[in-house]
């Protein structure tokens, strides 16, 4: 669970939960007992997978790491089936989720506390780190690219490594 997220369930054998906020799930497939997630706007039926659900005040989002989920508006039957590395969003009041760009593996950094960059432009690296750490980062040379894996322990350590590796200067505001 991300900070301020909630998850409620009845405690019986029923695999139905209600949630708010952002939550990462790993769910084992059980055809006889499907796993259902209800949010304020959305309904997600799990078909065995690892995925994230983010239920905000203006939209809901589902990002699938592996497996499959069915993502629908709470009051509608028609939805979209998402598979590995697919993402969809449901705007408040919409009848059906829209498939969106898959996003980045770093979309799950809040849960994994790890970053992965593969020939990623520096400005994209800095945007990812800025969002995660709640700061603004900029560099004197954004034409370079970075490949590497980082634990999300200390931003200053990550920035030092990037600066030394790419011979750039990063400023933080």
Region spans (language model):
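A residue-level detector for the "anchor" residue at the start of short, highly conserved motifs
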Residues: 2-173
